[in-house]
Amino acid sequence: MSAFVLGSTGLVGLQILKVLDSSTAFKKVSTVSRRLPSVTSGKINSIEKKESEEWPAIIEKEAKDYSAFFSAFGTTRAAAGSADNFKKIDYGINYEAAKAAKAAGVETFVLVSTIGANAQSSFLYLQVKGQLEEDIIALKFPRTIILRPGILLGERETSKGLLNNLSVGVLKYLHGTPLTFLGNPIFGAEVAQIAVNAAQESFEKGDEPVVKFYEARELTELYKKL
C-alpha cells in the first residue's frame, strides 16, 4: 500500500506519519509541508514547499494511484488572523489538495475533522469543517473516511494558545475515565492509529462510493481496543 499525508507537522498528522512509517502494510509514504516533519526514514518522501498554492500539483504527481490520502491539515481562526484567512487555509488548501488526490487516482481519502462539524453551524470553525466534509464526499472517492475526534491531546510543535493549553491540560486527566464524555478527549497518536487501521480495511467497490464516519465517542471506545 501507499499513502500521502497532508498536515504531517501537526499533532495528528505527525502521528499518522509515524504509524505509516512503522507499518508493514504501507511500503511508500509521501508528504508535502511548509517545513519538513521531524520523522525521517527511507520509506518517507518528504517534500518541503513553503508555497501552499503549489501543493496540488505536487500531490497530483506524487500521489499517482496511491492507496490512501490522509489529511490532518488545519489551523484556528486565531492562528489564521481572520475569518477569511481561516477559510482560505482550513477549507481552501484542504479542498484543493483533495481535488488533486482525486485526479491522481487515490482510492481512499481519510479526513481528520472535528466533533460537531456541520456546514449549517453558526460557529465558523464547525461550519467550515462541515462544508469541507460535504465537498470532499462530493468528489466521490471510491472510499471516504471521516474522523470527528473531540479534544485532541498530545504535545504540539506549535501552541494553539493559552486557553487551549489549559483546557487540554485539564481534559487529559479525564482521558480513559467515566468522565471521558466531557469533550471526548483523545490523544493524537490514538486518532492516527485508528485512521491508518481504517484505511487498511478492505472494502467492496460498487456503483456508489463508500463513506464512513467515526464520531468522537466511537473513537474514544475504539482506542481502548488498540
UniProtKB/Swiss-Prot annotation:
GO cellular component, one term: mitochondrial outer membrane
InterPro entries: Him1/Fmp52, NAD(P)-bd_dom_sf
GO biological process terms, semicolon-separated: import into nucleus
Record's keyword annotation contains Membrane: yes
Tagged with keyword Membrane: yes
Principal cellular location given in the protein's record: mitochondrion
Subcellular location per the Swiss-Prot or TrEMBL entry: Mitochondrion outer membrane
Domain of life: Eukaryota
Regions crossing the membrane: none
Pfam family, one: HIM1
Residues annotated as transit peptide in the record: 1-43
UniProt keywords, alphabetically: Membrane, Mitochondrion, Mitochondrion outer membrane, Transit peptide
Bilayer topology: Peripheral membrane protein
Family the entry assigns: Belongs to the FMP52 family.
Name this polypeptide is given: Protein FMP52-1, mitochondrial
